[in-house]
Amino acid sequence: MYSYHIERHFSDRNNWLRASVLGANDGLISTASLLTGVAAAAPDFQTLLLTGVSALIGGAVSMAAGEYVSVSSQSDTEKADLHKERYELANNPDAELEELTEIYRRRGLSDPLAAEVAKALMEHDALAAHARDEIGITETSAAQPMQAALASAASFCAGAILPLLVALTASSAIVPALAVSTLCGLAGLGYVSAKLGGAPVIPAVLRVCLWGVAALVITGFIGKLAGVAV
């Protein structure tokens, strides 16, 4: 008796993992950078609260809208390709069969086997076969705009809440507190994203921390130069 084994791959998580990592990273860095600049100029509670909440809400909405529009464009392109493929299958099936056969030949199958595989897949689900092997669209890689938008908004809020809480609760030395907490958050984010994606941990952590430090230094310097409420 045979058991049916389904192997999960890291690439299956691409759609939501990319949007989530981007959203959390953006929320953490942008909010921390903005609060650092403001704190360096005018570190009063009311200004920090207004700045932080505005950054969180505005950033989350912006991320969701941008991600939805971007992924929707990708989805529209995929639908157009599938519509074209559906038309070709209905009007020129022999040419489509030969096209699929040639794809399998280029992948190393012998001519008879390539023709046999192409014919079997065309009989089973012709559109799915061409979508997968000719266009490169699969169930796991297909664009999902709403999923990406919600993941971006939620992860942005998750990333932005850390520097906001630190800025509002730190009684003194707000800028150093923001810097330390942001770097810790970025290191944690890099670690988690690397583990979920099956990538090396150290390069992922260094990558996000490097850009975080650059953003904090630049905005803190600008805020210090301004010396007034932003």
Model-derived regions, located:
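The feature identifies polytopic integral membrane transport proteins across all domains of life
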Residues: 12-23, 45-52, 113, 145-150, ...
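Core segments of transmembrane alpha-helices
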Residues: 27-32, 152-162
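Structural signature of hydrophobic alpha-helical transmembrane segments
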Residues: 172-185
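Interfacial loop-to-transmembrane junctions
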Residues: 188-213
